[in-house]
Amino acid sequence: MRKALKDSKRIVVKVGTSTLTYENGSVNLMRIEKLSRVISDICNMGKEVVLVSSGAIGVGVGKLRLEKKPETIREKQAVAAVGQCALMHIYNKFFGEYSHVVAQVLLTRDVLENERMKNNVCNTFDTLLEKGIIPIVNENDAISIDEIQNILNFGDNDNLSAIVSTLVNADTLIILSDIDGFYDSDPRTNEDSKMLKEVYEITPEIEECAGGAGSNRGTGGMVTKLSAAKVATSNGIDMILANGENPEILIDILNGEDIGTMFVAKKGE
């Protein structure tokens, strides 16, 4: 089953705020540098990668030296505007060191609702990838309240990453989180919880295992990851949920190693 991942040509990688920042909210430069190096190496293998990156608000909080996340929507959007600029500067610097060019793509939900805009976005992705450019995608937090309000919309970009996977016709979606995979109960509160290696169908029982919200640095929990898995697998895309603490895990996943939880695509449906 996992050996097929070796043949993945087009991959979407999603990293959340908790992967990109320390507990105190400051940017984890070492991890972003390693992530940039690993993705660059994957591209050097002849594969295409789209990076969906959260972290605009988290990085903005660190950049502005705020003690905590802002609470009002207008403050969050202002902080996101600062953070997105800083985040892209960091990505541009690190990917540039490995001779790769990146492009910023900021999306809002109306892209999905307007067929003309959707086609334009698809054409942009295709052109960037044809030219060997790595698209770095985020929701446009400065003008969109979907992720900020976290009302079952993109959800810390988990759902956005699945949607992007369908837009670019990806073979595989890899979501890097601060947890090793999908468990039958919360491993942070239940030491007897067991990680599921493969999920072939998202049943009501599986949904019940998802629990509630995620870490306090992001907005997505297991609920949004399951939602992303539904979108990806129903469109024939395998999804892997794994721990992003060491970005080199991406290489292992694409080598077909038994890492994280694999949500198996529904082929030919």
Swiss-Prot record:
Superkingdom as given in the UniProt entry: Bacteria
Enzyme class: transferase
Binding-site residues, substrate: 54, 141, 157
Subcellular locations according to the entry: Cytoplasm
Annotated InterPro entries: AceGlu_kinase-like_sf, Asp/Glu/Uridylate_kinase, G5K_ProB, Glu/AcGlu_kinase, Glu_5kinase, Glu_5kinase/COase_Synthase, Glutamate_5-kinase_CS
Transmembrane residue ranges: none
E.C. number(s) listed in UniProt: 2.7.2.11
Annotated PROSITE patterns: GLUTAMATE_5_KINASE
Keywords recorded for this protein, A-Z: Amino-acid biosynthesis, ATP-binding, Cytoplasm, Kinase, Nucleotide-binding, Proline biosynthesis, Transferase
Pfam families xref list: AA_kinase (PF00696)
Protein name: Glutamate 5-kinase
Organism of provenance: Clostridium perfringens (strain 13 / Type A)
Lineage: Bacteria, Bacillati, Bacillota, Clostridia, Eubacteriales
